[in-house]
Amino acid sequence: MAQPVWAGVDAGKADHYCMVINDDAQRLLSQRVANDEAALLELIAAVTTLADGGEVTWAIDLNAGGAALLIALLIAAGQRLLYIPGRTVHHAAGSYRGEGKTDAKDAAIIADQARMRHDLQPLRAGDDIAVELRILTSRRSDLVADRTRAIEPNARPAAGILSALERAFDYNKSRAALILLTGYQTPDALRSAGGARVAAFLRKRKARNADTVAATALQAANAQHSIVPGQQLAATVVARLAKEVMALDTEIGDTDAMIEERFRRHRHAEIILSMPGFGVILGAEFLAATGGDMAAFASADRLAGVAGLAPVPRDSGRISGNLKRPRRYDRRLLRACYLSALVSIRTDPSSRTYYDRKRTEGKRHTQAVLALARRRLNVLWAMLRDHAVYHPATTTAAA
């Protein structure tokens, strides 16, 4: 006999645990299944058989990562799939009997929550370009973090060896200074080589302003004649770090090129780029965070809630109208919206006017930028809904 069933999946990397319940919360299936296509297809078939023609609702606590294969198979099979964040499962577990925590219990809680709740977000087939952008932007973030970790230790040993050279160059921005460190790290080495040889070394490696950089380096070297303890070992470390940073710069550039190529192929690229403050990277991060499909967000308010730009009430008793920042939101989406708003203040007069107005109202800088980001998100959502590019507001002077 046909019956509706709910299948809760506690997802993992190597395997998943599935619990299937009926309308009375009776357990029909409890099974651990390997994260393998054949095993997952068998599980889907088994759950479908249990329903015997009734509606099957799947719920899972991951929307990417180890659950990607199962999600793809369920969507391809036309199954209804809901997403329950792990934080929600954790808090819901407190309302169930017992303090124990097992994969089976988590899967049962996920299935039961899917059975009772009607506000869970369905998972849809991802936009291929948005999925690729999510991978690339995540990789870019890792590379930038690696570069930051490398450049900071690079500065500290260099400061101990040649503090004057450290003050003369910004290694975070000057590629020529990094090239210099791959060949010369100590005052003695710079003085022995001389300005002409150092400049030739830089020109051979296509450094910009080679003569100026060489002259600055020699001036710094002539200002320090003392030998610092551990100087030779520190010089070796500095040279390796400089090469590492340069290699990371190359990889970041290659990643940026791949991001731009894919982003410009997306149907929303032209619309997003027309919005002041959005460039290729921030636009790609926006698409990666939203999935590239505004149909998933019924309104601009819903999108703002996901981005963490919609304040939530914290009322209790006689206290009302107490609005706070939400705790659960997409950090990547908020970052893209916040940074684009920050850029638009410098490039767009209307954004600057709105920001200044919020500042005169007593808002702090961060609060004013967040308010601007919320306003811009409303506009961007409407633009994507109507497939219209941004047109600055124009005013007509009175005659």
Swiss-Prot record:
Keyword Manganese: no
The organism of origin for this protein: Mycobacterium paratuberculosis
Highest classification ranks of the organism: Bacteria, Bacillati, Actinomycetota, Actinomycetes, Mycobacteriales
GO molecular function, one term: transposase activity
InterPro entries cross-referenced by the UniProt entry: Transp_IS110-like_N (IPR002525), Transpos_IS110 (IPR047650), Transposase_20 (IPR003346)
Name of this chain's protein: Insertion element IS900 uncharacterized 42 kDa protein
Family: Belongs to the transposase IS1111A/IS1328/IS1533 family.
Highest taxon of source: Bacteria
One GO term of the biological process aspect: DNA transposition
Pfam families xrefs: DEDD_Tnp_IS110, Transposase_20
Keywords: Transposable element
